[in-house]
Design a protein with these regions (language model features):
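Polytopic transmembrane helical bundles with strong interfacial aromatic enrichment
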Residues: 4-156
Length: 156
């Protein structure tokens, strides 16, 4: 019979952050593109496509930050140079901004969507916030890429 604690031990050792982190990047980008198309050609797409994608992006961003915190704790034990630790801290800060920004934006968007169902101004405002969130996600992804490809964080 399999021992459940061995399975949980294996899950804790597997680096999940690299696998999960790409979902919020892709979903925020897709939400921005689809919402922009919906504003440009309203009859082509449903108004809720970007909203649904933003919901999934928020969930995946929460998972990415939680797994990233686990990976940062592992990186702290390795003893990287100060420059690398500063970049890790900056990456964590941008990740937290993405998560909390996504949560607040999603709750606000859902509330205003149901309050003002057919207001084009809400859609334009949502597009502006999606663009801002996309920029922050891009900066966070860039710092994460620097950590991996330049500083070797998370590589064997």
């Amino acid at each position: 019979m399999a021992k459940p604690y061995l399975y949980l031990n294996f899950i804790m050792l597997v680096p999940l952050h690299p696998a999960i982190v790409h979902f919020p990047i892709a979903l925020v980008t897709a939400a921005l593109i689809l919402h922009g198309i919906q504003l440009w050609k309203p009859n082509w797409l449903s108004r809720v496509g970007g909203l649904w994608l933003m919901g999934w992006a928020t969930i995946s961003a929460i998972a990415a930050v939680l797994t990233g915190q686990k990976e940062a704790a592992k990186a702290g034990k390795i003893g990287y140079p100060t420059e690398t630790l500063i970049l890790i801290e900056r990456h964590e800060t941008f990740g937290n901004i993405v998560v909390w920004g996504s949560i607040v934006f999603l709750i606000g968007w859902v509330y205003l969507f149901f309050k003002y169902k057919n207001d084009i101004r809400l859609d334009r405002l949502a597009l502006a916030f999606l663009l801002l969130l996309f920029i922050i996600v891009t900066v966070s992804a860039y710092t994460g890429g620097q950590l991996v490809y330049i500083h070797g964080v998370g590589t064997p």
